[in-house]
Amino acid sequence: MGIAGNEWGFQVGTLPKGTRDKISDVPGVTVGHCTLADGVVQTGVTALLPHQGDIFHEKVLAASYVINGFGKTTGLVQIDELGTLETPILFTNTLSVGTAQNALVKYMLEKNPDICETTGSVNPVVCECNDCGLNDIRGLHVTEQHVFAALADCKADFAEGAVGAGRGMRCHGLKGGIGSASRVVELDGKPYTMGALVLSNHALFDDLIVAGTPIHTLLNNSIPPHEDKGSIITVLATDIPLSERQLRRLCRRALVGLSRTGSYCGNGSGEIVIAFTTANRVPHYSEKALLPMTLLHDDAINPLFRAVAECVEESVLSSLLHAETVTGNHGQTFRSLTELLKNRA
C-alpha cells in the first residue's frame, strides 16, 4: 500500500514499486495482526511469515543490525552467529515479549515434533516497542491466544497503521504503527523485489520530513512537546540471492531511510533491523556437507541499497498516513497525520 495515491502528492524515490507496495510483494511473505483496542488497552501483536513452507526445516539466510540498542528484541544473537532465521518474526509491546516468545515456541513445537526430541532447540524472534503512552502496558493484556490469532491472520494483503503491534505506537509525536513498502530491482534482465516493514514508535514531530517537506511548515496544529524515546523495528525481505554478509550490509542502509524522515536515532530509541532473503534457504537436515548457492556480485549491490533506503523511508511515512487518531491510557491522544493534513487551515 505504501503512500501511493495520497492526495497531497507525496512521493518517495524513483524506483518502481511492487504490485501492493508492501513487503508481501516478496513472494511467500505474509503478515497478520491481532489488535486490542478497548479503552486503556491499545496494543496488539503482528506476525510475519518469511515463506509459506516449514521455516524451521527450510531456514532462510538472515542478518541483523543494531543502530541503537535501547531494545529487548530476542533471537538476534543466533541470527548473527548462524546467519539464518528459523521462525516467524513477531512484533508486540515491550512487556509482552515473554508472552509472545512462549507462544511462538509452542507454535513451533506443534509444527515440528522433532524440536528438542531428535534435534536441537529453536530460536524465536520477537521484536518490541514500548506503547505505554497509549496502552496500559503494565496490565499485560497480550495473551498467547492473541499471538496465535496474529499468526493465523497472516496474508499478503495486510492492513497498515494503528493495527496489531502498532496499535499503541507514537511516531514523530503522531500516531504511528505498522508501515510497509516495496521496490522492484532488475538484475540480469530479471525483476526482483525488495520489501520493508516497520513498527514505528520514535522521533520528534518538529523533525518530521515527509517526502522532502518539513511537515511542521504545512501544519498549524500544535503537537505537545515530547521526548525522543521509543523505538523503530525494521524488517527487510527480498527474493534476491544474497549472503548473510550482504544482508547485513542492507540492514545498515535502513538508517538512510530513517534519516530521510527526520530521525537522528536518539539515546532512548531502539533501532533494530533484521533482513532475510527467501532465495537462499538452508535445510535443517542435509545429506550433503556442501550446499550450492547463488550469490549477487557485490558490484551489483548499489540498486539494492537505494531500494532499502526508499522502502524504509516510505514505510515510516505509510505507518503515519494510514494510522487514525487514537485515545487510550490516561486519556492520552496521538493524532493522525492524515487527519491533521486534511484539517489544516
What are these regions (language model features)?
Residues 1-345:
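Alpha/propeptide regions of enzymes that mature by internal proteolysis
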